Curated annotation (Swiss-Prot):
This is Envelope protein 167. Induction: Early structural protein. Belongs to the asfivirus envelope protein p22 family. It is found in: Virion membrane; Host cell membrane.
């Protein structure tokens, strides 16, 4: 009687194994309907991430806000808690507040000079920094009530941004 029961169990296990073997040969593994995490799109510039307002950060398209992206791109950056917003520009993170001239930038602050631009002195100062050797950030102080302002460049690798009103600070993005 035990022998019959043992043969029945072995036969049952053999049939189950044959069914799994046959189903594996004729029915290949199917992809899941929804992946756990969607694949990240690689990019070099923001234009590569046109869809849904994404920006290129660290070589991948992401919806990361500008402040988080700056912290991701620039390891060890110390942002002043008063700085609560920034905007993406093609080559820079542009902050709504700026560095204090007495900050750790110290001697690295280079006064480029007074600029006259009736449209946007900030954009002009930014483009000058992008073409100035060693410039890692810029600041534009508009002279009250005029279309002129002072443009400053900075050369420190990890700026510690300090709060100050009526000026704009920007640091370069790591664009691949």
């Amino acid at each position: 009687m035990y022998l019959v029961l043992l043969i029945a169990i072995i036969l049952f296990i053999t049939i189950i194994l044959v069914i799994f073997l046959i189903s594996g040969l004729f029915y290949p593994e199917q992809n899941p309907l929804l992946p756990i995490s969607p694949p990240k799109k690689k990019c070099k510039i923001d234009v590569d991430c046109k869809d849904n307002g994404h920006h290129c950060v660290g070589g991948f398209c992401t919806k990361m806000n500008c402040l988080e992206a700056a912290k991701y791109d620039i390891k060890g950056i110390k942002l002043d808690p008063n700085i609560r917003s920034c905007n993406y520009t093609p080559k820079f993170y542009k902050f709504s507040s700026t560095a204090d001239p007495q900050s750790p930038f110290g001697k690295s602050r280079i006064e480029y000079g007074e600029l006259y631009d009736p449209h946007s002195g900030e954009e002009f100062c930014e483009s000058l920094c992008a073409n100035y050797p060693g410039c890692i950030s810029w600041e534009y102080d508009q002279i009250s009530g005029k279309t002129t302002g002072n443009c400053y460049f900075y050369r420190n690798p990890h700026p510690a941004l300090k709060y100050k009103s009526d000026a704009v600070m920007a640091i370069p993005r790591k664009v691949l």
